[in-house]
C-alpha cells in the first residue's frame, strides 16, 4: 500500500473530531479573541454565545476555512485542516448569515440542486416536510419570507449528508415553532453521531448542548 493510501486509510478510520488550539481571530485591526481552545467530538452540539461584535461569525468563518487564523491550529480527524481541505470541506455544511437561496427557483428546486451537488441525505420532499415548508414547495425563492428562507437554507443540511454542521445564527427570523423544529434537527444530528456548532446571541434549549462564551 502506498504512502498516500495509508494516510487516507488512517483518516477514514479516525473518528470525526474538531480540535481548536490557540486560535486567534481578527476583524480589521481589532483582535476579537485569542488563545481559544476547544474540542468537539462525535455526537456533540456546541453553542457559541456572545454579544454582537464579539467574534462569533469570525470564529465560524475560521472553522469553515473562509478566513485564515491569525494564530493557532485547527484539526479534523486528528489532521491539520490545511493539509486535508478537500476531505474536510466534503464533510462539513455551512449556513451563514446569507441564505443563498436562488430567487428564480422554487423551494423544491433549490433543494433539488443542493442535493444534486452534494447529496447523500434525505429526499428534498422529506426535507421540506421536516422544516414545515411543503405548502410552499412550488413558490419561487424571491417570494419567501425571511423565516421561510431561513428554514429552506437549513433544510439543505438534510439533503447534504455531512458530519459537521457550522451554523451562523440559525434561529434568526424564526418563530417559536420553527425554533423548536430546528433545535430538534440539531439534537437528531448529534444523536446520529454528527457534530454541530452554532452561534446565537440568546439562549436556545438544545439537549446536552455545551456552551462556549466569547467575551471581548
UniProtKB/Swiss-Prot annotation:
Family: Belongs to the ABC transporter superfamily. CcmA exporter (TC 3.A.1.107) family.
SUPFAM superfamilies with a match to the protein in the record: P-loop containing nucleoside triphosphate hydrolases (SSF52540)
Source taxon at top rank: Bacteria
Cellular localisation: Cell inner membrane
Protein's recorded name: Cytochrome c biogenesis ATP-binding export protein CcmA
Residue ranges constituting the ABC transporter domain according to the UniProt record: 18-216
Role summary: Part of the ABC transporter complex CcmAB involved in the biogenesis of c-type cytochromes; once thought to export heme, this seems not to be the case, but its exact role is uncertain. Responsible for energy coupling to the transport system.
A GO CC term assigned to this protein in UniProt: plasma membrane
Assigned keywords, A-Z: ATP-binding, Cell inner membrane, Cell membrane, Cytochrome c-type biogenesis, Membrane, Nucleotide-binding, Translocase, Transport
Gene that this polypeptide is encoded by: ccmA
Disulfide bonds: none
Keyword DNA repair: no
Single GO biological process annotation from the record: cytochrome complex assembly
EC number per UniProt: 7.6.2.5
GO MF term list: ABC-type heme transporter activity; ATP binding; ATP hydrolysis activity
Gene3D superfamilies according to UniProt: P-loop containing nucleotide triphosphate hydrolases
Residues in the signal sequence: none
Membrane topology: Peripheral membrane protein
Assembly and oligomerization: The complex is composed of two ATP-binding proteins (CcmA) and two transmembrane proteins (CcmB).
NCBIfam families reported in the protein's UniProt record: ccmA, PRK13538.1
Catalytic activity as recorded in UniProt: heme b(in) + ATP + H2O = heme b(out) + ADP + phosphate + H(+)
